[in-house]
Regions:
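N-terminal single-pass transmembrane signal-anchor helix
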Residues: 1-13
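Conserved functional hotspots that engage anionic ligands or polymers and/or phospholipid headgroups
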Residues: 11-13, 21-35, 39-145
Length: 145
């Protein structure tokens, strides 16, 4: 009888330990995905700020980033560009906004907010590498490149 009780307690302890281990693993992967999402968003803002819209006659709409280890992929979409009176400016003054991006242009009346971008960033795990725990995090933010 005592052997049954001890084996039952041991079985419950092992089951709890495996559940706890899986929880730590899931939490670690989710934190890694969130950190990669944040760094990818910063990289996208850097790409947007350095992109010459007049030279290319368009604007950046989509930026895709894959983690170096291949575990995660991030899709970043620029949904709106907020421009003072709907016009673009650079060092030499007012420049035309590319006509191919007119659907992304949102005219605003505050010069202080000129150039802000509404970004949607989605991070997902690579389904071939992490099959057990699907991760998908969506973030929308208003950023200033």
């Amino acid at each position: 009888m005592i052997v049954l009780i001890v084996s039952g307690i041991a079985l419950l302890t092992l089951k709890y330990a495996s559940i706890q281990s899986r929880h730590y693993s899931d939490s670690y992967l989710k934190e890694q995905a969130e950190l990669f999402l944040l760094s990818s968003t910063e990289a996208a803002l850097l790409a947007i700020s350095g992109y010459d819209r007049q030279k290319h006659n368009n604007c950046l709409r989509q930026i895709n980033v894959i983690s170096p280890d291949g575990r995660f992929k991030v899709n970043i979409t620029a949904e709106k560009y907020f421009l003072f009176h709907g016009k673009d400016y650079n060092e030499s003054g007012e420049v035309p906004w590319p006509s191919s991006c007119s659907d992304l242009n949102e005219s605003i009346g505050r010069k202080e907010s000129h150039g802000m971008v509404l970004i949607k960033a989605v991070v997902e795990n690579n389904s071939t590498m992490l099959k057990d725990n699907p991760i998908r995090i969506v973030r929308r933010s208003l950023q200033w490149p």
